[in-house]
Regions:
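Glycine-aromatic micro-motifs
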Residues: 1-118
Length: 118
């Protein structure tokens, strides 16, 4: 089966949550998304507040986890990431090696207060 690399930030940093969403997910490495910052641009009715998103911002970085998972599970992840769209992003690992990975961003960004979970 084909495997893909997925850059997680926000609530998907929680290994229990990722395991429930994508049982095949395994931590591959820590990574940094350059020239972005973390913001809360999507209102989650499930969490009753703003959910994390990555927003372009020169000079800042967002750290996350790159998981390796079965490509077949991407459709499951798409459903969980309902208000987000799948994107391809360049990240760097802690050895400064470059990787192109799948992640999710909010297409229509607004500003919300983060949920209490953050």
């Amino acid at each position: 089966m084909s495997r893909v690399l997925y850059f997680a930030y926000g609530s998907n940093l929680d290994p229990e949550q990722m395991a429930s969403r994508c049982p095949s997910a395994r931590v591959a490495f820590l990574a940094r998304l350059a020239d972005h910052r973390l913001d809360f641009t999507y209102f989650s009715t499930r969490w009753s507040g703003g959910s994390a998103d990555v927003v372009r911002h020169f000079g800042e970085s967002v750290w996350g986890i790159v998981y390796q998972l079965d490509a077949a599970e991407l459709q499951r992840l798409d459903r969980f990431e309902g208000g987000y769209q799948r994107v391809f992003l360049p990240v760097r690992d802690d050895q400064e090696r470059s990787w192109h990975v799948i992640s999710y961003e909010v297409p229509l960004k607004r500003s919300f207060r983060p949920t209490h979970g953050y």
